[in-house]
């Protein structure tokens, strides 16, 4: 899950810390040292994690947007300036903004807040924010709880005694409580020094950033894998005394099933399953990450020559169009499947079902599923034209179709450019031209985007005027016809703007002689 590191750069972080036998450090130096340790760990063990860096005092600033380049994050730590008083609320508002803008409100996120425990003074201080949170309007609400699933980890550049001498610890605990109890406060054990800061950040790493390694099993075949992101414990709400369920480190495949039978089931979370490569010695299992490029290349070459069950499983599921049912724990299952990342790349994914004996009602109880060979006759029929499970409806649902997505401007621009490219290749691309044109027309009508139809019509008329003299005469006729039909649809009248109506090619005939045409 993404991580936002929030660094306090107020004046209180410049307070000196005396360390015997060495130069004088400031608290911000200790914080930067701890974050460097965290970034180095993530660069080695959490390379797929997206991390952003935010700094704050009375205002907040996004220093590094979400990235996987941990060198950039470490460079930003050394370029931070000192500012004015502390205002934690503004930092939390900034976190809300950047996470929602990048990930929306459904993706879980971890927030690491690094501060010295000073709450600020006067208006804008944490004391003032907490005292007035119940007196605010909905438009000016306190940013906690975050409007997305989250965990808030507060790293204090102070020891427990220092925080308890004021009400700082109590106010910071209120932040965790306001975030629905999701998170934890870390303090320095003993005097403020580099060693104790490393120990504190080590506890955070053990809690939140330890990679999840497991053994994938299928009969006698096994493979060491990393599951990313780390699966979170799941608490069953219906239980009288709920106990968090944690998935086993032994993931055993209990069977295989057609994709059509399992369809698109509800899941708790989705995870990448990555085979763990051998290290450069080739005799121990590691993450495959080495000190330099030459060693890394040699390690990859060694790993590429060794057969791996994870690779075999991924390829088999992709070719056969099946998914593997995997046992996660007692009465808890998931599925392994191949998911296309692009036209040429796919990943082995694992989705977790809800715990229980019957997570997918149409399959029945998982414990009662068995191989086809146990049945008296093939439940799929001799020609593979039946299914032992409730059949899916013949009409595809909207989520199963290739719908037009214009969330970003680039999506709309791509669709318009596709129409123009086909327009320049008329009449050879007549069928493709009208197919793309009707797809855009339907989407525009569905969204009420009538101005788009007029705009595309103007573009087609312009393309018609730019046709070269050598162009086929049919091209001009088709472009003019398409532009006229789009302009009629842009009026919104029911006669020309029917959603189910398609623009058909203009019937022309240039096969006869010129005298016959006259």
From Swiss-Prot:
Key words, A-Z: Acetylation, Magnesium, Metal-binding, Nucleus
Q: Does the keyword Nucleus apply?
A: yes
List of residues binding Mg(2+): 10, 12, 86
Q: Which InterPro entries match?
A: INTS14, IntS14_b-barrel, IntS14_C, VWF_A, vWFA_dom_sf
Domain VWFA, chain residue ranges per copy:
2-204
According to its UniProt record, in which tissues is this protein expressed?
Strongly expressed in numerous cancer cells compared with their non-cancerous counterparts (lung, prostate, colon, stomach and skin).
Q: Which GO terms describe its biological process?
A: regulation of transcription elongation by RNA polymerase II; RNA polymerase II transcription initiation surveillance; snRNA 3'-end processing; snRNA processing
Could you name the domain of life of the organism this protein comes from? Eukaryota
- What's in the GO CC field? INTAC complex; integrator complex; nucleoplasm; nucleus
Q: Which residues carry this modification: N6-acetyllysine?
A: 418
The free-text function statement in the UniProt record for this protein reads: Component of the integrator complex, a multiprotein complex that terminates RNA polymerase II (Pol II) transcription in the promoter-proximal region of genes.
What is this protein identified as?
Integrator complex subunit 14
- Origin organism of this chain? Homo sapiens (Human)
């Amino acid at each position: 899950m993404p991580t936002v590191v929030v660094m306090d750069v107020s004046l209180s972080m410049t307070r000196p810390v005396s360390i015997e036998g060495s130069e004088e450090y400031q608290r911000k130096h200790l914080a930067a040292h701890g974050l460097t340790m965290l970034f180095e760990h993530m660069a080695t063990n959490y390379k797929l994690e997206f991390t952003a860096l935010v700094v704050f005092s009375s205002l907040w600033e996004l220093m590094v947007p979400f990235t996987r380049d941990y060198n950039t994050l470490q460079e930003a730590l050394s370029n931070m300036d000192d500012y004015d008083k502390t205002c934690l609320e503004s930092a939390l508002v900034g976190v809300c903004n950047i996470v929602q803008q990048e990930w929306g409100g459904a993706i879980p996120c971890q927030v690491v807040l690094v501060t010295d425990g000073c709450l600020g003074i006067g208006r804008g201080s944490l004391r003032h924010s907490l005292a007035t949170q119940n007196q605010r309007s909905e438009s000016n609400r306190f940013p906690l709880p975050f409007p997305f699933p989250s965990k808030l980890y507060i790293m204090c550049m102070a020891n427990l005694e220092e925080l308890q001498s004021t009400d700082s610890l109590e106010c910071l605990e209120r932040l965790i409580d306001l975030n629905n109890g999701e998170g934890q406060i870390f303090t320095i054990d003993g005097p403020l020094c580099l060693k104790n800061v490393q120990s504190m950040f080590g506890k955070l790493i053990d809690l939140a950033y330890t990679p999840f390694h497991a053994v994938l099993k299928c009969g006698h075949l096994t493979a060491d894998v990393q599951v990313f992101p780390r699966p979170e414990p799941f608490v069953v709400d219906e239980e009288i005394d709920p106990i968090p369920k944690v998935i086993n480190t032994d993931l055993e495949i209990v069977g295989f099933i057609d994709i059509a039978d399992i369809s698109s089931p509800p899941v708790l979370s989705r995870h990448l399953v990555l085979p763990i490569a051998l290290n450069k010695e080739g005799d121990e299992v590691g993450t495959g990450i080495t000190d330099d490029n030459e060693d890394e290349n040699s390690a990859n070459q060694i790993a590429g020559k060794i057969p791996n069950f994870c690779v075999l499983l991924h390829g088999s599921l992709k070719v056969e169009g099946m998914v593997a049912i995997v046992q996660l724990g007692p009465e808890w299952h998931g599925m392994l499947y191949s998911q296309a990342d692009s036209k040429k790349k796919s990943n082995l994914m694992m989705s977790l079902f809800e715990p229980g004996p019957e997570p997918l009602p149409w399959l029945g109880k998982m414990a009662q599923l068995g191989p086809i060979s146990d049945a008296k006759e093939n439940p799929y029929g001799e020609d593979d034209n039946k299914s032992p499970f409730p059949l899916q409806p013949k009409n595809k649902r909207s989520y199963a179709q290739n719908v037009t997505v214009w969330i970003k401007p680039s999506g709309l621009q791509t669709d318009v450019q596709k129409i123009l490219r086909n327009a320049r290749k008329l009449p050879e691309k007549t069928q493709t031209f009208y197919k793309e044109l009707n797809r855009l027309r339907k989407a525009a009508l569905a969204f009420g985007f009538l101005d788009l139809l007029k705009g595309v019509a103007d573009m087609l008329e312009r393309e018609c005027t730019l046709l070269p003299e050598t162009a086929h005469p049919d091209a001009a006729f088709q472009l003019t016809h398409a532009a006229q039909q789009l302009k009629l649809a842009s009026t919104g009248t029911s006669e020309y703007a029917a959603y189910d109506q398609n623009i058909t090619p203009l019937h022309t005939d240039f096969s006869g002689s010129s005298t016959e045409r006259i």
